[in-house]
């Protein structure tokens, strides 16, 4: 029966009498759910009738990791491996086909071109190494995620063993990441040494060329001095004879 003291209950009661609880435009779902009288019997508050995600957690993680691997593989093929192969071909053919052309250029231009090619090659090598270690780290992280789900929940010992293995795998992944950073630092250090050594070689070549020019000019000055002394001696001889 409708009650004048409960207008919200009267609204729901009228909707029930009309037989259009979920179809009447005047019905408010929020009012129905928040109503304490019908809250216990409401189908909207029952967890079993709510929309659930039918995909399990490991399946979602597996699908997400597969998408990540696919994206990284595409990025590696089109942005890393192909440019790296082209760089290696360029670096291999650089001294075979362009050595004679560079010999005719200035030493500074030759040094700049060789430095650019060397830096580009090392940068691509660093990217390859970092990407490889990132894939290894991703594999270990996936093992860390899936290791506890391998063991069943009711098997206590197997579950603890799986968690222990997962923890070890996590630390191994961190160690691999640190090793990748160490290798990157070593590669950059080697790159710096190569550039310094190349700079020293060009400096030695310039110094040797300057020394060669000095050596070639010194005998000419000696000859002129000798000629000058000969002239003076001849003049002295002529004056003495006279």
From Swiss-Prot:
Transmembrane domains' residue ranges: 75-95, 116-136, 176-196
Region of interest: Disordered: 204-242
Membrane topology label: Multi-pass membrane protein
GO cellular component: cytoplasm; membrane
Localization (cell): Cytoplasm; Membrane
Biased composition (Polar residues): 210-232
Keyword annotations of the record: Cytoplasm, Membrane, Transmembrane, Transmembrane helix
Superkingdom of source: Eukaryota
Basic and acidic residues bias spans: 233-242
Stated name of the protein: Uncharacterized membrane protein C18H10.18c
Lineage: Eukaryota, Fungi, Dikarya, Ascomycota, Taphrinomycotina
């Amino acid at each position: 029966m409708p009650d004048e003291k409960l207008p919200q209950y009267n609204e729901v009661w009228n909707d029930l009498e009309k037989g259009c609880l979920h179809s009447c435009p005047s019905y408010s779902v929020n009012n129905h759910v928040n109503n304490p009288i019908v809250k216990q019997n409401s189908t909207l508050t029952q967890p079993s009738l709510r929309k659930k995600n039918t995909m399990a957690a490991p399946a979602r993680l597996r699908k997400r990791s597969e998408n990540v691997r696919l994206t990284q593989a595409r990025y590696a093929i089109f942005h890393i491996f192909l440019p790296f192969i082209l760089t290696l071909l360029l670096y291999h053919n650089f001294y075979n086909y362009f050595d004679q052309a560079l010999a005719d250029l200035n030493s500074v231009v030759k040094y700049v071109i060789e430095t650019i090619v060397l830096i580009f090659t090392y940068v691509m090598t660093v990217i390859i190494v970092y990407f490889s270690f990132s894939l290894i780290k991703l594999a270990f992280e996936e093992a860390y995620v899936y290791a506890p789900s391998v063991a069943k929940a009711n098997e206590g010992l197997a579950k603890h063993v799986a968690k222990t293995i997962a923890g070890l795998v996590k630390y191994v992944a961190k160690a691999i990441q640190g090793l990748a950073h160490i290798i990157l630092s070593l590669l950059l250090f080697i790159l710096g040494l190569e550039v310094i050594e190349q700079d020293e070689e060009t400096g030695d070549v310039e110094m040797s060329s300057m020394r060669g020019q000095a050596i070639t000019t010194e005998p000419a000055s000696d000859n002129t001095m000798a000629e000058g002394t000969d002239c003076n001696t001849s003049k002295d001889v002529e004056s003495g004879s006279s």
